[in-house]
Amino acid sequence: MFNEIKDFAAPELDVYARTSEVQLLRYYEPEPGIFIAESPKVIERALNAGYQPISFLVEHKDLEGGAQEILKQYPDVPVYTAEYELLVKLTGFALTRGMLCAMRRNPLPSVEEICRNASRIAVLENVVNPTNIGAIFRSAAALHMLSLIHISEPTRLRC
């Protein structure tokens, strides 16, 4: 179902416009929260990995473009849509691929579960800059890493 954005203050748009990363992370506490995936390619990978969509935010022109196949698979998930300029105003940044998706986070596996069957693991310790994390994830994928462990508080990790 497509919903034309008419009211920027609509509460269903909060996750895209007025909720910080920390608030998204804790959205359903004590259960895992929400994350925002950007671009059809990233959204498709997340869906294939078992993450559940909550809603989509799609630029008008992409309703018939790259988003179309994904949206067909989830006809009951709300789709909020507007022209590019309105989406930039709503989100505060330029959508590079015309599509965002709010998704439920899955519970994180334990370090033991990750290490059990993985032969190639990359470990990030105290890396917090999103640009650096993105570059490292892309490099890990290029090097065929099977898992990536991100440790923001090394003293909390116990194997």
What label would you give each PLM region?
Residues 41-43, 62-63, 85-87, 156:
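Alpha-helix capping/helix-boundary segments
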Residues 149-159:
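Single conserved hydrophobic/aromatic residue that forms the stacking wall/gate
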Residues 65-76:
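Short, aromatic/basic amphipathic alpha-helical patches
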Residues 94, 98-118, 122:
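Acidic/glycine-rich phosphate/pyrophosphate-binding loops and surrounding catalytic core
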Residues 1-60:
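Boundary-proximal intrinsically disordered activation/regulatory segments immediately upstream
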Residues 75-88:
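A glycine-rich helix N-cap at a beta->alpha junction
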Residues 5, 35, 125-126, 152:
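Glycine- and other small-residue-rich loops at beta-strand/loop junctions that grip anionic moieties
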Residues 39, 128-136:
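Amphipathic alpha-helical repeat scaffolds
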